[in-house]
């Protein structure tokens, strides 16, 4: 594993929902593919009613510990059905889900969450959790969305070109190599890019058509990763459109969509880029969001 800052495990948040079960399956396959241990965690949190107490009442605690134990035991059995030799550990915590997962992100290669499918309210809550983890966590986060993608579907990565470095491109190459599938690198621009509005110059000589200049940006961003992963077949796509629109279109044909936490025009201190937010809430396939160098 060569992803910068990568940890040594795949961590999945477990709550027993159908979306969580999908996340466990996805996380188990990812851990097996990357030869990493799988950690299944459940944080039930202490309700506000007990906030002033050192520990909640014993009957409440016992009931929640038993529930967590059953949830995690079922999730571990599910993971072992996918790979009987996979190292799996489980952890229940009094911490709430977000504090627990942020803490686990310190040593995780990736955090994995499920989506809620048909439940709009639950999906909103999970989306909020994912956004919080994308902002405060220290590892990439995958939200497992959509149906079961075809095994030969490509990995798709959004390439910005403005960031001083885009480590998620390397992560996308690694994921495509592990799956032995094509990588589609999508670079999208429009006439209202914030970078242009603030005077950043993309073509200092003013001679190349915009399309040629943007294609050069894409090729330059991919060049070092093509050298590092020569076995990965790459399709480079440069288009004039809204980034979120085209990436969401591609999500219907991909098995994994990879993006940075902030894109062009992203400023230090902003919570999360609008494109990353749209992908977390609306992607039709699992979406992996990696932190921007500005974070």
List each model region and its residues.
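Short glycine/serine/threonine/alanine-rich loop segments
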Residues: 34-37, 86, 139, 181-182, ...
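Short beta-strand elements of ligand-binding domains
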Residues: 112-115, 141-146, 287-291
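Short, structured interface segments
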Residues: 129-147
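Structured core of small recognition/catalytic domains
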Residues: 182-261, 268-270
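Glycine-rich, Arg-bearing micro-motifs that act as flexible, cationic patches
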Residues: 113-132, 152, 256-282
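Structural beta-alpha unit
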Residues: 1-6, 19, 59-62, 77-111, ...
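A short acidic, glycine-rich active-site loop
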Residues: 58-70, 204-214
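Small/aliphatic-rich secondary-structure junction motif
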Residues: 2-58, 154-205, 226-237, 295
């Amino acid at each position: 594993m060569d992803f910068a800052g990568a940890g040594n495990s795949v961590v999945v948040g477990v709550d027993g929902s159908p979306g969580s079960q999908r996340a466990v399956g996805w996380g188990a396959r990812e851990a097996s593919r990357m030869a990493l241990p799988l950690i299944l965690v459940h944080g039930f949190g202490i309700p506000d009613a007990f906030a002033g107490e050192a520990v909640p009442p014993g009957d409440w605690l016992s009931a929640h510990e038993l529930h967590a134990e059953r949830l995690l035991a079922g999730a571990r059995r599910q993971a072992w059905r996918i790979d009987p030799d996979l190292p799996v550990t489980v952890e229940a915590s009094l911490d709430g889900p977000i504090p627990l997962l942020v803490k686990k992100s310190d040593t995780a290669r990736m955090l994995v969450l499920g989506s809620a499918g048909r439940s709009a309210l639950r999906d909103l809550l999970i989306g909020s959790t994912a956004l919080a983890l994308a902002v405060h966590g220290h590892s990439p986060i995958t939200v497992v969305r959509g149906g079961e993608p075809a095994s030969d579907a490509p990995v798709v990565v959004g390439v910005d070109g403005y960031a001083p470095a885009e480590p998620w491109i390397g992560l996308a190459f690694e994921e495509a190599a592990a799956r032995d599938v094509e990588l589609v690198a999508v670079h999208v621009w429009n006439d209202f890019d914030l970078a242009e509005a603030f005077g950043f110059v993309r073509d200092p000589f003013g001679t190349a058509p915009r399309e040629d200049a943007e294609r050069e940006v894409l090729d330059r961003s991919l060049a070092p990763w093509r050298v590092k992963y020569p076995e990965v077949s790459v399709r480079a796509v440069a288009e004039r459109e809204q980034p979120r629109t085209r990436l969401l279109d591609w999500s219907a044909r991909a098995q994994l969509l990879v993006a940075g936490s902030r894109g062009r025009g992203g400023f230090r201190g902003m919570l999360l880029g609008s494109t990353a937010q749209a992908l977390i809430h609306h992607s039709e396939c699992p979406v992996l969001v990696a932190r921007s160098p500005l974070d």
